[in-house]
Amino acid sequence: MVKKTLGRRKVEIVKMTKESNLQVTFSKRKAGLFKKASEFCTLCDAKIAMIVFSPAGKVFSFGHPNVDVLLDHFRGCVVGHNNTNLDESYTKLHVQMLNKSYTEVKAEVEKEQKNKQSRAQNERENENAEEWWSKSPLELNLSQSTCMIRVLKDLKKIVDEKAIQLIHQTNPNFYVGSSSNAAAPATVSGGNISTNQGFFDQNGMTTNPTQTLLFGFDIMNRTPGV
């Protein structure tokens, strides 16, 4: 008698080309896989973690007692004679990371402390600098002396400008030389006035007080010269 069927044959394991068959097979096999894993945990008191990605990219997981607990145990708490080196390597790496974090934080703290001390010192110097006017020049420190010199220079500049302004108001043709580096003297109203000195330098005014200009006008007395 001839057999009507081909009998039991071994199915070739290849990827399915038909999309609908692939999705149906995945759903059935996934459920069967998780069921077998659950039975294995019950029979052998084993701890299992499974993560499955579907063809569409969805994630499915199974774990006993919990997937997260088992993953943490695998990453950081590996024990056993065969995994001693792995555990030591992980511990060393963890210590190195902690040391690096500690060094960075310590550097930031030291930097902030230095900035704080610098700001406090500047505030103290500013407070002391404001008291220079009530002390003798011999009693001033560096910061107070610097403040005094700066204020006096500003005051001298204001006085010079005010004096020149008043002179120009009384005699528009009068010119006072500046402390510029110009080599040639300025010619004003027929006379030469040196520009190598400031208006209030130690040598006094930039021209002889009794000098009579060509136009016969006495500078100091503002009267016609002899």
UniProtKB/Swiss-Prot annotation:
A GO CC term attached to the entry: nucleus
Effect of loss of the gene: Embryonic lethality when homozygous.
Keyword annotations: Coiled coil, DNA-binding, Nucleus, Transcription, Transcription regulation
MADS-box domain residues: 6-66
Signal peptide, first to last residue: none
Region (Disordered) location: 108-131
Compartments, as annotated in UniProt: Nucleus
GO biological process, one term: chloroplast organization
Positions in coiled-coil regions: 95-132
Top-level taxon in the UniProt lineage: Eukaryota
GO molecular function terms listed in the Swiss-Prot or TrEMBL record: DNA binding; DNA-binding transcription factor activity; protein dimerization activity
InterPro entries in alphabetical order: TF_MADSbox, TF_MADSbox_sf
Primary site of residence: nucleus
Pfam families documented for this protein: SRF-TF
Compositionally biased intervals (Basic and acidic residues): 108-127
General function of this protein: Probable transcription factor that controls female gametophyte (megagametogenesis) development and chloroplast biogenesis during embryo development.
Protein name: Agamous-like MADS-box protein AGL23
Protein's organism: Arabidopsis thaliana
Gene it is expressed from: AGL23
